[in-house]
Amino acid sequence: MTETIKIGTRGSALALVQAEMVCAGFREHHPDVTCEIVEIRTSGDWKPEHGETRLSEADGGKGLFAKEIEAALIRGDIDCAVHSMKDMPAGLPDGLILDCVLPRADVRDAVILNGRWRGRVDSLDALPKDTVVATSSTRRAAFVLNKRPDLSVTPIRGNVPTRIDKVRGQDMADATILAYAGLERLRLQDDVDFILDPQTDMIPAACQGAVCIEVREEDRALRDLLKPLNCPESDICAMAERAALQILDGSCKTPIGAYAMLDGQTLDLVVAVLSLDGTELYKERITASVTGRADAIAAGAACGRKLKQVVPDHCLTC
C-alpha cells in the first residue's frame, strides 16, 4: 500500500522548491511513498502593507517563519516540515527535532546591483562612497558597515524576486545582498553581480544554504525513512554552527556569522559577533575532530562559550 507523507512548508517560491527537493529525495529512496506538499501561511510572510520594517524580536523574530508550521506538525496536520535552516530559532518546541539536513548548497552571500552599477563594480571595496545597500539582515548590515563604514544600509522586505525588483526595477537602493543558495535554487544566479568571500568579506549566517526537515521526535517510522535523505557532512557543519548560535543565544537581531567546514573528520569552525553598527567585531575559530552530530554540537558549543567570554553584553542583547 502506498504511504502518503504530508510535508508542511511556507508558500513562497523558494520554500516550495525546497519542499520539492524533499519529495525528490523520497522518490529516489522510497518510490512507494507519495508526498503531499501542504502550504502554510506564516506570520513572517511579507505583505506590501508591511513596508520595509524589520521583523522584531518582540513580534517573534525568526520564529515567525516557523511557528504556524510547527503548530500544524504538533497537531498532526502534517508529518514533517521543511525549512531554510538559517531561519530556525535557536530553541524548538518540545517534542520536535531537526532530524535531517539535505546536501548543503553554496553558503556564500551574493550582491545584486542596481542597473546603473552593473558591470562597473565587482566587490564591496569598489562600491562608491554613500552607496545604499538594502538588507534587513542585521548580520549583513553589520559586516557591510564593518568593512565599509562610508556606505549606507536600509531595510528591505519581501521574497527573493520582490527584493531583486525593488533594487533593479524600483531603484529603491544601489544594491542588495541575498543568499546565493536561494538564488541558485530559483535559477536566478544570472542576476548576481558578485559573490562575497565567506572568510574575508562576510561570514555566512549559521546554517545558510542548508535545508532541514523537522519532525515529531516520537515518529520513529518517519525518522527511519528520512535517514537516506540526510547528508552527514552537511548535518555536522550545520549542527556545529547552530550549537554555537544557541550558546550565544543569538536572536534574529544579533549580528552573528558562523561557518563550518569539514575535511575528513576535521571540523574547522569560525564564529563572529558584531555590534549592530559594525564598529565592533569579535571572532573565534576552533578545529576539532568529529565523527558525528554529537561531536559537532560539542565543538560548536565550545566555540560559542569561548566567544561569549569576550563579547560585550550589549552586542548580544541588541
Regions from the language model: what does each represent?
Residues 91-92, 143, 186-187:
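Glycine/Thr-rich phosphate-binding loops of Rossmann-like dinucleotide-binding domains
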Residues 6-8, 81, 99, 134, ...:
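Short, well-ordered beta-strand segments
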